[in-house]
């Protein structure tokens, strides 16, 4: 943390406690509400009650505290998990538009809570004039993120597995590997958040890429970046989520003029190198 300025301050607080939330937002102009009890499919599939309870408390407290403290603007990090299951049952699907969220039928409780909390912030906007911005993230990844312990998402988990594997080894892939996803690198995501917060647009907006990849091909891409030949063993008993998910960024590009710039290969190269280097050092 040698590059921190005199204006950086860190507080480790449990935002399920309203008093802590009031302390966190006191004297703050803008709040970026990213706190959540979450993880990849392996976590959210088996922690439904924890995810719904903890995250609902965090976001209700954050909205109320921001209103009471007179925060100028609030960013809420929603998720592509809000989109209905019935629109994601095939591997080849059109990108999901913001309007597709209704009629609502998310794949899991994490998605239901995200959609509920969107409406919490919107309710505070309607009733109390809270100035809000909402982004629906589509699989954000990059260095410095969780890559082990059970909460990691697919890009980090696959990078870790391939980092540990030797050339010619076999790694476990959840599901049949035919699922499709799009992935957005963290730097692009941050640019999108900044653009949204500087805009006047106060409705939910996708932040992601519109280029989907088959998970089996994604594994091959990471292996190629690592310079290894990796075989796959598919475990059909493990959670695999919806069959296909991709982002429609038409609205985001029109409203913000924002579009992801970093290719999947470039982003995965940076992510893999960080995870691989971290494991070697530790």
Model-derived segments and their meaning:
Residues 4, 8, 15-55, 68:
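NAD(P)H-binding glycine-rich loop region in Rossmannoid oxidoreductase-like domains
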Residues 15, 36-37, 79, 137-140:
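Active-site loop/turn elements of alpha/beta-hydrolase fold enzymes
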Residues 17, 30, 58-61, 73, ...:
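Conserved cofactor-binding/catalytic machinery of classical short-chain dehydrogenase/reductase
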Residues 33, 60-108, 133:
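Conserved Rossmann-fold NAD(P)-dependent oxidoreductase catalytic core, especially the SDR/UDP-sugar
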Residues 38-43, 85-86, 143:
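Helix N-cap/beta-alpha junction loops of NAD(P)-dependent oxidoreductase domains
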Residues 86-95, 119-197, 210-212, 219-226:
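NAD(P)-dependent short-chain dehydrogenase/reductase
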Residues 109, 113:
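Active-site helix of classical SDR
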Residues 164-282:
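C-terminal substrate-binding subdomain of Rossmann-fold SDR/epimerase-dehydratase oxidoreductases
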């Amino acid at each position: 943390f040698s590059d921190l300025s005199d204006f950086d301050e860190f507080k480790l607080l449990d935002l399920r406690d309203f008093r802590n939330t009031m302390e966190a937002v006191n004297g703050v102009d803008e709040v970026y509400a990213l706190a959540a009890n979450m993880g990849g499919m392996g976590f959210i599939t088996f922690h439904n009650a924890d995810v719904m309870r903890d995250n609902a408390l965090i976001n209700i407290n954050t909205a109320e505290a921001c209103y009471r403290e007179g925060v100028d603007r609030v960013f809420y990090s929603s998720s592509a998990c809000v989109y209905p299951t019935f629109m994601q049952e095939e591997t080849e699907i059109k990108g999901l538009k913001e309007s597709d969220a209704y009629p609502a039928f998310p794949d899991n409780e994490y998605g239901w809570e995200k959609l509920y909390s969107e409406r919490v912030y919107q309710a505070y906007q309607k009733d109390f004039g809270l100035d809000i911005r909402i982004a629906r993230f589509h699989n954000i990844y990059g260095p410095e993120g969780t890559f082990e312990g059970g909460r990691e998402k697919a890009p980090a988990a696959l990078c870790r597995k391939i980092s540990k594997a030797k050339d010619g080894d076999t790694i476990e892939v959840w599901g049949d590997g035919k699922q499709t996803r799009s992935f957005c690198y963290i730097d692009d995501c941050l640019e999108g958040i900044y653009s949204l917060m500087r805009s006047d647009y106060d409705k939910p907006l996708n932040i992601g890429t519109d280029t989907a990849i088959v998970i089996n091909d994604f594994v091959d891409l990471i292996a190629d970046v690592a310079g290894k030949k990796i075989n796959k063993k598919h475990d059909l008993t493990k959670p695999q989520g919806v069959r296909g998910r991709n982002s429609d960024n038409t609205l985001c590009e029109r409203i913000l003029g924002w579009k992801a710039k970093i290719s999947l290969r470039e982003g995965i190269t940076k992510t893999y190198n960080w995870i691989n280097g971290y494991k070697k050092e530790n």
